[in-house]
Amino acid sequence: MKVAKIVFWIAGIWGVLVLTPLYFLFDVIGRQDPPAITHPGFYYGFISVRLAWQVAFLVIARDPVRFRLMMIPAVVEKFGYGASLLVLYLQHRLHPSDLVFGGVDVLFGVLFLLAFFRTSA
């Protein structure tokens, strides 16, 4: 249970710290990594959904035994994003440097699986 608490606290805090600034970087991202973002609803919606998951990770961290089953969709969230970026990269639609964040998510996905199996039902 201690592993799960630590892993989910770190993931939640990391996510909040990384995602929150994106609310204020809409135009900067378009300039530094063209083309410009053309669908702000998708952009801000993506950030909002990801932040909601960070809150879920922090909730899981408070009581991993009680919220053990929520670890399953948390794993799907992490592996889903990593897999999406990998497919885009293989299609030459993503810069290799963008894979870093997908790699962090896959790492957290593996740690979430570890936490799931180490937390008693």
Residue map of PLM features:
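Interfacial loop at the N-terminal end of multi-pass membrane proteins
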Residues: M1, L22-G45
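Cytosolic juxtamembrane helix and N-cap/initiation of the first transmembrane helix
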Residues: M1-W14
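Core segments of alpha-helical transmembrane spans in multipass integral membrane proteins
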Residues: I13-P21, T38-R62, P73-F79
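Structural signal for membrane-spanning alpha-helices in multi-pass inner-membrane proteins
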Residues: L19-L22, F57-A61, L85-Y89, F112-F116
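Non-cytosolic membrane-interface motifs at loop->transmembrane helix junctions
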Residues: Q32-F42, L69, P73, R93-V104
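Membrane-helix interface "capping/anchor" motifs
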Residues: R62-R68
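Membrane-helix boundary connector in multi-pass membrane proteins
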Residues: G82-V100, F117
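Membrane-water interface at the C-terminal end of transmembrane alpha helices
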Residues: L107-A121
